[in-house]
From Swiss-Prot:
SUPFAM superfamilies associated with the record: Cytochrome b5-like heme/steroid binding domain, DEK C-terminal domain, Nucleotide-diphospho-sugar transferases, P-loop containing nucleoside triphosphate hydrolases
Enzyme Commission number(s) of this protein: 2.4.1.16
Catalytic activity: [(1->4)-N-acetyl-beta-D-glucosaminyl](n) + UDP-N-acetyl-alpha-D-glucosamine = [(1->4)-N-acetyl-beta-D-glucosaminyl](n+1) + UDP + H(+)
Protein name: Chitin synthase 5
Primary site of residence: membrane
Any single Pfam family the record assigns to this protein: Chitin_synth_2
Enzyme class: transferase
Organism: Pyricularia oryzae (strain 70-15 / ATCC MYA-4617 / FGSC 8958) (Rice blast fungus)
Gene giving rise to this polypeptide: CHS5
Length: 1787
């Protein structure tokens, strides 16, 4: 056996990436970057390589129960670590120890899966032994369904250098098992169980005789098991059944030799332990104690008296724990015997090493006798694992670190905090490490001594031949050896072995039960939980320490080094070694020559070993050949070798563990070059900035220095005159074009000129400074629109305020008696008299009256609101002259009207007090009437129906004459009272008879007839009648007929009321639509692919970062969302210190030295502005543990634009069109421009998602923050309603209290969503989906018909010629609203919805000027868009509430906002001044409007909005008057370009002057992706078929080629469009997280690297290094795959061998079936492949193996294709689906 290398604590430190050229890592690893990378590998079920000797994996019980390609379960492990450990052991003839450490109590065991991934064949008995041992050392706990209760368990493998296992053993560490937690002191909480073996015992399907002999009962009958009340395994486990597990255990025990009498002794001991546990209660009854001890003594062969009398309760407790641990040791010893027996059979040739699955292992005669030991040490104890790892990594006082320091290698201190934590960890785990000096150690020592004493006391008196004694005394005559014999000395193993670390992380603190409900096995994730584990173990410091300073995985004595590598040119002596190192291109950091040793990093060592492998065996130097691969064993595949060396199996498509559902599992590469050749093709622009402006040392992303130091430069000539502007008026030297004008446009122009003909154009040109005809025309159009708006507003004000007065004058100057009665206040004191209404509020309090009759307030108060006719009658002889009435004659008034005698004012001779002024007969006409005239208000009116009713029904003697009402009731009653005395009958009988016969009627005609006849026949009679009529007017007149209810007066009111009712109905509907009381349950996770588009213009860094962070943090599957940032030009916003694209790229963590080429595409612009250039960047962005792919497109403009202020800027609409057009061409598989081809390549081949998979487009603004669940809610809404084409959520303000201007917007934002949009959403026709937060469906769910990416929408939305006022307002101001209008126009039967539960926040304008500008755009675009909507045909709904009507209401409401404000001001004035009737209905409507809104706030518990509503109302004049007026008048306030000038419109033609070279569409080459990919050897070709069904696991568009690079930006081959330099390429950096710690500098060894022109890109995978961080080497031809399929003896697991980046993975979309498939057929084009019978057989075989209750059809299809080793498409896919249904139906 080869000698052991002592104190080899080498922990390798190569990063996840490929070999580093520098000696030190350039970037430190932080917790965030490490957290990001861990999340990536968790999603991909891959390991993460922390350094060359350390791997991290993430596992849960879910991942541990998933079957791998070999059909076994166990979770994620790193086979590469096992392979590295083996290669170091065999090549260096040194022992190794792989520590499987757990960082969390919930992590499952990975011992068995790790052993299965080992690069040598292990005997099957090893796995059977571990299977048998598991129930003894694991138990159920709430935090882990298989919680380990042992400190450490080791499997030691002794192998010869040929890779044959010569010996193997299993052993517990000396710390043993925690029997307290697993048996004696189970927590009395639900969810805990004892060791699983006891439940298996009770559930075992043993014979009845066996159960009777053991006396077994239910688990609840045993005190040891009944503490927690949990007896069954967790129900969430897919195979949770103690009975089945018991059968498996019995079979496993039988395999390792525990059968027959041994099995009976074994189960007897277990039963005895259960029974003995019933005696551990201090209060146990003595009889019960004796009975139990009698039973236990019989099972164990021990005298019951010893157990009952000589052992205390504590002794029995110690006995139970010690005996159980001794039983476990016995099981392990039996297992080791079985392993040795199998190995003996293998050596004898009777059995193969892998149980018959492979070739026979050569016997011992075939090896040279040297052996090495590899110990796989599982350390589930958190404290022990942490102590072992941190001491080995950070402690410089021992191990390899100490040896390096002594040899002169600079070893930086780990830092005081790290060393302190390391020391604390070692102290904490001291007893487990054998250190008994501390308090815990002394307690542990006391426990062990006590246990030995009790076991010896009981064991001595046991029967000599009993099993019990054999357990306690396995070696006769040596006493109790428990914890020593057969145990593993961890300190000794580590002291003689090279240590490797395989650390298991758990992704969440959630209970295991909660994981069962997750949608996928990799869904559980808590960044805080993982971060806590990383920090607790100091893994960032670990990575930085190892990778920066101590990345040495091999070390040699100087002589040994020379001897081994002399054949490669290494010469003797230190100088010879250093010279050879320099020749190899290794820096001092890669190979360090110490005082006595040479220390090598992993990459350098493998390069040297690779060169040795390439040498013929005969050339090997002495001492080296025996360490090389022996005959018949393939050498390791290092990636640097050409013949391989047996390290890794061939890594190809079939070996990568990725799928399109597993994004972020590979390191992304961006595809651009650092430099271009001197020449370039016309189709591609050179780098944007001239070389003289580019900061090559610091990097500027290839965007130049514009905006960083000098902004908005204006070019002037030597004379200081502005240059570059066109002649704005004349079209000289310009190309003249003629365009057809639509009929509607011609009619509008005619109307404009008809209204504005009187305004001369010279006046506009010279006074208004409008030199251009199109600008003047826009002003005229604006004038006409404002004039029309003014007329509408004036009409509204006139209609509401003045029309009613014109139709019904004096309607507010009359009152009924009841209305008069309402005025009884101290300041509102009204009375009526003789048909007149008086307001005596200023009179009644004034003392007045005669001597002795002074009127006071108390006396006057009762008369308020009353009629004073009976109280103040005129003298009858004065009121009725010419009728012969005596001066004392008076009528008797109605008694009911003169109840208060104090009010009687009898004037004239009838006054009883001659001294009173009333005694004057002229007091009434001369004093009373003139004074009352001062307080006259109007006429008293009577309802005609009331007059008629009382006259006809109550014999009320009153009539109507000429609309005057005369009441003769007192006249007739006085006559009746006076018996018709002649003196009281002073009225003409002809008149009174009419009244008597027609009371309550209109007698105008009758009386007029009497007057006419008298006038014709008898003038005396006529004179008498006239005197009668005069008397009527003076004495009997009581008012006029109420005219306010006539048709003339009511028509306008009814019109207003009708509109009021309609408005109220709309408001009520809006209110109802806002009352959505449904629960806000979070929808289930969605699996749709979504592009999150963020157009960036001049936003600041804070806004951009918040927007990107919010998208990254969305609670949506990270692999199914893509952030697409489109920077609209290279320009610097106000307050920024650099251009917006640079800010975006800085945030995303892109390397500033990256300079992708500028690629042409067609923009939305006039003439030559349609040609634009853009750059594409891609990578990963990390925030709070979420890692999301991104694509950034920067519009950089043509070369001629670089001197302008805004190169590349074409507007937000162009940014939207850029992506929409790309997705349109992806959908139709149409030819693409170079920029789109590069975008397709970045998304499809680098990010790994077929762009056709994306189903939704989420549009947000760069200053918008989206709530975490918003995207899920929007997608869920669309998933539940396939008719939804667009949907938006609620937008609120994030800066609501920043200024007064933001405060007045809060309420408006809330109510515009919860009333307006919620109401429109009822019709499925939200008229404005805001661009700041809207999601569109890309294609219909049923037939895949394109929606927002349809040709019609893109054609209308990308109108390049925006040269009229209407188009300007549509496409330049309100592009978001117009996009909604176009969607509604082209897809009228689709729905556009509002989801109030999807929430985002945006930044509102904080300054008045900004608010003014924003609202100008909004208001004007609203008007013009609603006009467009009014013209649509399919806008009708149900009843009158059609969508067209709602649109009309919105349009009209926007236009008449100023009138609304004026009317509200008028109302306030009217109410405040009391100059008119109280507007009750209007105020009720206003109260209803805002009351319902307030009710919404209250019901939604948004109390704060009540306050915001008050602030909004205070600012109402601003919103309804100032902003609209300003907006209307500034409709033509645009920047008018000089490229195309409309110089005139005549008839059907528009004359346009063009001042540039124009745009030739042929200047932008177009090519289909498949043709482009085929011509340039790119993967991801999709074939000619249309879109196919997208599956979760298997995709029909598997990669076909052996490379993933962009023709525009990858190094090889040069772009067919750019002809770029072939010597350089760049690696696109990821976000500041995952891989900043990996150097990107190329190395000088082993030929080209991924960062140079790598010729290995097309080589067989045998020659590709798993260490190379590249995607080039991942692929190989199918023929090469088949040639090397069996080249390596190392078995491969699914997934790569080198973790996240060390081994390449397929991008998302490469499924497991695709990885294992070696061919892909389209049976429509290729007749090869399986026939129908083979497919049916495969389906039946798969259905026999899967769980039909949980498996999905897609999974069955994937498994069938995997079994067939073929991907089925076309008709074969259809047949497969149909046959699966048939088989399921027949089962």
């Amino acid at each position: 056996m080869a000698s052991r290398r002592m104190s080899m604590y080498s922990v390798t430190s190569e990063g996840m990436g490929g070999p580093r050229g520098a000696g030190q890592q350039s970037t430190s690893v932080s917790t965030t970057t490490l957290l990001n990378a861990i999340h990536n590998i968790y999603l991909a079920s891959q390991p993460y390589r922390l350094d060359a000797g350390t791997s991290l994996v993430v596992n849960t019980w879910l991942t541990a129960t998933q079957a791998g390609p070999d059909g076994e379960v166990g979770g994620t492990v790193d086979p590469a670590l096992a392979a590295r450990a083996w290669e170091h052991a065999r090549r260096r003839a040194e022992d190794g120890c792989i520590i499987l450490g757990s960082l969390h109590q919930s992590t499952p065991s990975v011992m068995k899966p790790f052993l299965r991934s080992f690069p040598v064949s292990l005997p099957s008995s090893v796995f059977k032994a571990l299977e048998a041992l598991d129930p003894f050392i694991h138990c159920v706990a709430p935090f882990n369904p298989s919680a380990p209760r042992h400190a450490a368990l080791g499997v030691t493998l002794t192998m010869n250098l040929a890779g044959n296992v010569t010996a193997a053993s299993i052993a517990l560490s000396q710390a043993g098992i925690d029997t307290a937690a697993g048996l004696l002191s189970i927590p009395a909480e639900a969810g805990y169980r004892a060791f699983d073996v006891f439940y298996h015992l009770l559930s075992s399907a043993s014979t009845p005789a066996e159960r009777e002999f053991l006396g077994l009962k239910s688990a609840s009958s045993y005190a040891l098991l009944a503490r927690s009340g949990t007896y069954d395994p967790p129900s969430y486990l897919p195979t949770a059944d103690d009975g089945a597990s018991a059968d498996d255990l019995r079979a496993a025990l039988k395999e390792i030799g525990i059968k027959g009498s041994s099995h009976r002794d074994f189960i007897s001991t277990l039963a005895a332990l259960l029974k003995l546990g019933d005696t551990l209660d201090y209060t146990v009854d003595e009889e019960v104690l004796e009975e139990v001890c009698e039973d236990v003594g019989g099972l164990l062969g021990v005298d019951p008296e010893v157990l009952a009398k000589q052992c205390t309760t504590e002794d029995r407790q110690t006995l139970v724990g010690g005996l159980y641990e001794a039983l476990v040791d016995w099981v392990i010893s039996k297992a080791n015997q079985a392993i040795q027996a199998q190995l003996a059979r293998i050596r004898d040739g009777d059995e193969s090493s892998d149980g018959g699955r492979g070739a026979r292992t050569p016997n011992s005669a075939e090896d040279n006798g040297d052996t090495v030991c590899l110990t796989i040490l599982e350390v589930p104890d958190l404290a022990l694992a942490k102590a072992l790892a941190m001491r080995g990594i950070f402690d410089d006082s021992q191990g390899i670190n100490s040896e390096m320091k002594q040899d002169g290698v600079e070893v930086a201190s780990a830092g005081q905090s790290v060393l302190r934590e390391t020391q604390n960890a070692v102290v904490e785990a001291g007893p487990l490490l054998g250190d008994m000096s501390g308090p815990k150690g002394r307690d542990r020592q006391h426990h062990l001594e006590k246990r030995e004493e009790v076991l010896e006391k009981v064991g001595i008196v046991a029967d000599d031949d009993c099993f019990f004694k054999k357990l306690l005394f396995p070696v006769s005559g040596q006493g109790i050896q428990l914890g020593q014999a057969g145990r593993l000395d961890i300190q000794g193993v580590l002291g003689s072995s090279r240590a490797w670390y395989h650390l298991s992380i758990h992704p969440t603190d959630d209970s295991p039960a909660s994981l069962a409900a997750l949608p996928s096995i990799n869904s559980a994730w808590s960044a805080g939980t993982v971060s806590r584990q990383l920090r607790a173990w100091r893994l960032p410091e670990w990575a930085n320490r190892r990778n920066k300073n101590l990345d040495f995985t091999a070390d040699f004595d100087v002589e040994e080094f020379v001897q081994r590598y002399s054949i490669l040119g290494c010469r003797e002596g230190r100088d010879g070694i250093e010279t050879w190192i320099l020749e190899r291109g290794w820096s001092n950091g890669e190979v360090v020559v110490g005082h006595e040793r040479v220390w090598m990093r992993e990459s350098a060592w493998w390069e040297a070993e690779n060169m040795l492998d390439m040498k013929p065996m005969g050339d090997m130097p002495m001492g080296a050949s025996n360490l090389m691969a022996p005959p018949g064993v393939m050498a390791m595949d290092t990636g640097y070798s050409h013949n391989g060396s047996g390290y890794f199996p061939p890594i190809n498509d079939a070996a990568s563990n990725g799928s399109r559902d597993q994004l972020l599992h590979q390191r992304n590469q961006s595809q651009a070059t650092l430099a271009m050749g001197m020449g370039h093709s016309p189709g591609v622009a050179p780098s944007v900035a001239p070389s003289g402006l580019r900061n090559v040392s610091k990097g500027d992303y290839g965007l130049g220095g514009k905006g960083d130091n000098h902004r908005d430069e204006i070019l002037f000539n030597n004379e200081g005159e502005f240059v570059g502007a066109l002649d704005p008026e004349l079209a000289n030297n310009k190309k003249i074009e003629e365009q057809q004008t639509s009929k509607s446009r011609r009619m509008w122009v005619a109307l404009v000129w008809a209204i504005t003909f009187w305004i001369p154009s010279p006046l506009l040109r010279y006074v208004g400074r409008m030199k251009r005809p199109d600008v003047r025309m826009a002003w005229r159009e604006k004038f006409v629109l404002c004039f029309i708006i003014f007329l509408l507003n004036a009409a509204i004000v006139f209609w509401i305020i003045f029309l009613g007065r014109l139709l019904c004058p004096n309607f507010d100057k009359v009152w009924t008696r009841d209305e008069v009665k309402q005025h009884q206040g101290d300041t509102d004191f009204w009375v009526s008299n003789r048909g007149k209404v008086y307001d005596i509020s200023k009179f009644w309090k004034i003392p007045h009256g005669d001597v002795g009759n002074e009127a006071t307030q108390d006396l006057m108060q009762p008369f308020a609101g009353l009629s004073m006719d009976a109280y103040i009658p005129p003298p009858l002889f004065k009121a009725c002259p010419g009728l012969g009435i005596g001066d004392r004659l008076a009528l008797v008034p109605n008694a009911t009207e003169t109840e208060n005698s104090a009010g009687m004012h009898i004037s004239g001779p009838g006054q009883a007090n001659p001294t009173s002024g009333l005694a004057d007969a002229n007091w009434y006409p001369d004093v009373f009437l003139p004074r009352m005239k001062e307080y006259y208000k109007g006429e008293l009116v009577w309802d005609a129906s009331k007059i008629n009713s009382e006259g006809q029904n109550q014999d009320h003697k009153w009539v109507i004459y000429d609309n005057k009402v005369y009441d003769l009731r007192d006249y007739f009653s006085t006559l009746k009272t006076m018996n018709n005395l002649a003196q009281y009958k002073f009225l003409d009988d002809s008149l009174t008879q009419v009244v008597e016969r027609n009371p309550g009627t209109d007698v105008t005609g009758t009386w007029n007839g009497l007057l006419s006849n008298a006038q014709r026949n008898n003038l005396t009679t006529y004179t008498t009648l006239r005197n009668n009529m005069n008397c009527m007017d003076n004495y009997f007149y009581v008012g006029t007929v109420d005219f306010r209810y006539t048709a003339r007066c009511q028509t306008n009111n009814y019109f207003l009321l009708a509109f009021a009712i309609i408005m109220c109905a709309v408001i009520l509907l809006k209110f109802v639509s806002a009352l959505q009381f449904g629960s806000k349950r979070r929808p289930s996770p969605q699996d749709k692919f979504v592009i999150c588009q963020v157009p960036a213009y001049t936003e600041g860094e804070d806004s951009l970062r918040k927007a990107l962070d919010s998208l990254t943090a969305l609670q949506y599957d990270n692999k199914r969302k893509l952030i697409c940032v489109i920077c609209d030009g290279v320009l610097t916003g106000e307050g920024n210190d650099r251009p917006t694209p640079k800010i975006v790229l800085d945030i995303l963590g892109v390397d500033p030295k990256v300079d992708p080429p500028a690629l042409p595409f067609k923009s939305v612009g006039a003439s030559s502005e349609q040609l634009n250039y853009g750059k594409v960047y891609s990578g990963l962005y990390e925030f709070e543990g979420n890692v999301v792919p991104y694509v950034v497109v920067v519009k950089v403009g043509k070369e001629s634009e670089q001197s302008k202020a805004k190169p590349g800027n074409r507007g937000k609409r162009d940014s939207q069109i850029l992506l929409m057009s790309f997705l349109n061409r992806v959908h139709h598989r149409a030819p693409m421009n170079p920029l789109e081809l590069e975008m397709f390549h970045q998304i499809n081949n680098i990010i790994g998602v077929d762009p056709e998979l994306y189903e939704y487009l989420l549009m947000i603004d760069a200053d918008t923050c989206v709530r975490e669940d918003a995207l899920t809610r929007l997608v869920a809404s669309c998933a539940s309603d396939a008719k939804i084409a667009g949907i938006c959520g609620e937008t609120s303000l994030q800066n609501e209290e920043r200024s007064w201007w933001t405060m007045i917007q809060v309420y408006e934002y809330f109510i515009s969503h919860h009333l307006a949009k919620a109401f429109e959403s009822l019709f499925g026709s939200v008229t404005c989906l805001p661009g700041c937060f809207t999601m569109y469906r890309l294609r219909t769910a049923d037939k895949g018909k394109p929606l927002i990416i349809s040709d019609n929408v893109i054609r209308d939305y990308s109108d390049c010629y925006v040269d009229t006022l209407h188009k300007k307002n549509l496409l330049s101001l309100g592009e978001d609203r117009y996009l909604t209008t176009l969607m509604t126009k082209h897809f009228p039967y689709m729905s556009f919805k509002f989801n109030p539960n999807a929430f985002c926040q945006t930044a509102a304008p904080e300054k008045w000027s900004v608010l003014l500008s924003q609202r100008r755009r909004w208001i004007n675009s609203t008007i013009h868009n609603l006009v467009e909507l009014m013209t649509l045909k399919e806008m009708c709904g149900f009843c009158c509430f059609s969508m067209r009507f709602v649109v009309f209401v919105d349009l009209f409401g926007t236009i008449i906002l100023p009138a609304t404000c004026v009317y509200l001001g008028y109302l306030i004035y009217t109410v405040a001044s009391g100059t008119g009737p109280f507007p009750l209905i209007t105020l009720i409507m206003l109260a209803a409007v805002y009351g319902l809104q307030a009710l919404i706030f209250i019901l939604k518990r948004q109390w704060q909005h009540i306050g915001w509503m008050i602030i909004y109302l205070l600012a109402f004049p601003i919103y309804s008057f100032i902003l609209p007026i300003y907006s209307f008048w500034n409709q033509d306030n645009f920047s008018w370009g000089n490229t195309r000038i409309v110089v005139g419109e005549s008839g059907k033609k528009t004359i346009v002057a063009v001042d540039d070279e124009g745009f030739d569409p042929r200047s932008i080459p177009l090519q289909r992706w498949d043709d482009y990919a085929l011509a340039n050897n790119l993967p991801g070709r999709r074939g000619g078929a249309g879109p196919t069904e997208k599956m979760d696991h298997v995709f029909a568009d598997a990669y076909e080629m052996d490379d993933m690079r962009s023709v525009y930006s990858a190094a090889r081959p040069g772009s067919v469009l750019t002809g770029m330099n072939r010597n350089t390429a760049y690696m696109s950096p990821n976000s500041p997280a995952p891989y900043q710690h990996m150097s990107r500098s190329p190395t000088a060894y082993a030929g080209p690297t991924p960062y140079s022109d790598n010729p290995a890109a097309r080589q067989s995978m045998v020659s590709m290094s798993p260490y190379q961080d590249t995607n080039h080497g991942r692929m190989m031809s199918m023929s090469n795959l088949r040639n090397v399929a069996n080249a390596s003896p190392v078995p491969t697991r699914a997934g790569t061998a080198m973790g996240f980046a060390g081994g390449s993975r397929a991008p998302l979309g490469q499924s497991e079936a695709a990885r294992q498939s070696t061919m892909s057929f389209d049976f429509q084009r290729n007749a090869a492949g399986p026939d129908d019978f083979q497919i049916v057989d495969a389906i039946r075989a798969v259905l026999m193996e899967v769980d039909l209750d949980t498996v999905t059809k897609k999974q069955v299809r994937a498994l069938v294709e995997q079994r067939l080793q073929t991907e089925l498409v076309g008709e074969r896919r259809t047949f497969l689906d149909r046959q699966i249904d048939n088989e399921l139906a027949n089962m």
